[in-house]
Amino acid sequence: MLQVFERLDHTHDEISDSITLDQDTRKKSRIKSVTDKGANIGIFVERGHPLLVGEILKTECGLLIEVKGKAEDVSTAVANDWLNFSKVCYHLGNRHTTLQIGELWVRFKPDHVLEQLAENYGLSVNSIPAVFEPENGAYGVRSHGHSHAHDS
């Protein structure tokens, strides 16, 4: 089994494999899974720092594994104006729900009450599977790792 104890922001070296994980799994500090090429892997990283899509993991034997996001069921609310978008974000934030915020759209785990709230402010809500990369919170540091490896 491959074992990971080290995270890299980026690398110029060749990526050996990848691992595709949903948001709930990326939050864990101890993960037992299978890479995209089928290798068993154990990931042991610092608690409180979720794995980020694009981040590079280094195995004990030196292989580099890229973290990828798995599409999952999410609700995406899209606004036509900044005022109603801001109001919806405010109310969703007051509910301490996990949010991914984009330009005039906000994404959250499916919840009919939250979907109705967004619709009440004129946002259109759709439920299409997507990679969920929520904000870490007011006191979390958010930085996306990246590699310079390119898909073949």
From Swiss-Prot:
This protein's record includes keyword Transcription = no
Keywords annotated in UniProt: Chaperone, Cytoplasm, Nickel, Nickel insertion
One Gene Ontology molecular-function label: unfolded protein binding
Instruction: Name the domain of life.
Output: Bacteria
Which coarse location class applies to the principal site listed for this UniProt protein? cytoplasm
- Give its localization: Cytoplasm
Task: Cite the Pfam families for this sequence.
Answer: UreE_C, UreE_N
The record's annotation in InterPro entries points to: UreE (IPR012406), UreE_C_dom (IPR007864), UreE_N (IPR004029), UreE_N_sf (IPR036118)
The GO cellular component terms are: cytoplasm
GO terms for biological process, alphabetical: protein folding; protein-containing complex assembly; urea metabolic process
| Role this protein plays | Involved in urease metallocenter assembly. Binds nickel. Probably functions as a nickel donor during metallocenter assembly.
Per the record, the similarity remark reads: Belongs to the UreE family.
| The protein's name in its UniProt record | Urease accessory protein UreE
